[in-house]
Amino acid sequence: MTEAWTQAVRSQLDLGRLLPLGGPHDGTWITEQAAVQALGRTAAEIPGVRLESLRIGSAPLQPVSEPAVRPPASALPPGSLTIEAAFTASLVRPLPETADELRSTLLGAATERLGLATVTADLRVTDLREVPEAGVTPRTAETAMRPTPEAAAARNSPPVTGTGSMRGLVRELADVAAGVPGVARLTAVLGSRPVRVEDHDDPPGRHIEVHLAVGPGHHPLKVARAVREAVAEAATTHTPGPATVAVLITETAAWRQTSPVTVLSTPQ
């Protein structure tokens, strides 16, 4: 039991923080690991830059909002986010110029390509090099936050819809979510099924939480919005109250092919 508990804790740490996507009414979160991997890939394209670490969290002293739906356990509330990055740079170009490009790249990609409400990027230079390193794979938080083999296997497995214990309503909603364009597959993280359904009586209603991966060519926030709409509509069957849906994105391959999306920091 102790080993299983330790493994569960490690898997949770691998995911990092659960970051809000969009605004309070979007009901969507993304794992810090997925966001960091995406930002690390685009930062690697900046000449002379090698990321050493990259973290994303709530911006200090900034207001937060109450989400419109129940968030995943331990998820950050909707609000402004900040990026913290440590990097090494080449002296081939002026350091301020390199830092400005890295900052604008990280902020722009986080906001436009992912849907994160990032407002600042704090950078720290850890080393300066005379010449650019050749043939070296950029070291980013993608490697620093690499999942354990067991966690990776769970997140890389095929969709579990229609198999095992996925029965009845849960199976139906899983099929609905998996069928939304842009959903690469449903994922099992945080020690739970890809789709969780909970009915409550006071007030009457139903809450669904969906964990998924976003495929290439699709914007994470747009996909999540479509999933929430489709699942909420399907989940109203045989329930006396409304259905609310929260989405957690655990992986995204949506990079360089997606179009920007509007991120709302206040309710619509």
Please give the residue ranges for each predicted region.
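Surface-exposed beta-loop interaction hotspot
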Residues: 113, 117-184
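N-proximal, solvent-exposed amphipathic alpha-helical segments enriched in charged/polar residues
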Residues: 16-71, 161-196, 267
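Short edge beta-strands and adjacent turn/loop segments
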Residues: 46-88, 122-132, 184-215, 243-257
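Extended, charged low-complexity segments
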Residues: 215, 225-237, 254, 258-268
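Actinobacteria-biased recognition of intrinsically disordered, low-complexity terminal regions
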Residues: 1-26, 72, 135-160, 252-268
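Short, non-transmembrane amphipathic alpha-helical segments
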Residues: 39, 43, 95-114, 219-240
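Extended, hydrophobic interaction surfaces within ordered domains
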Residues: 78-138
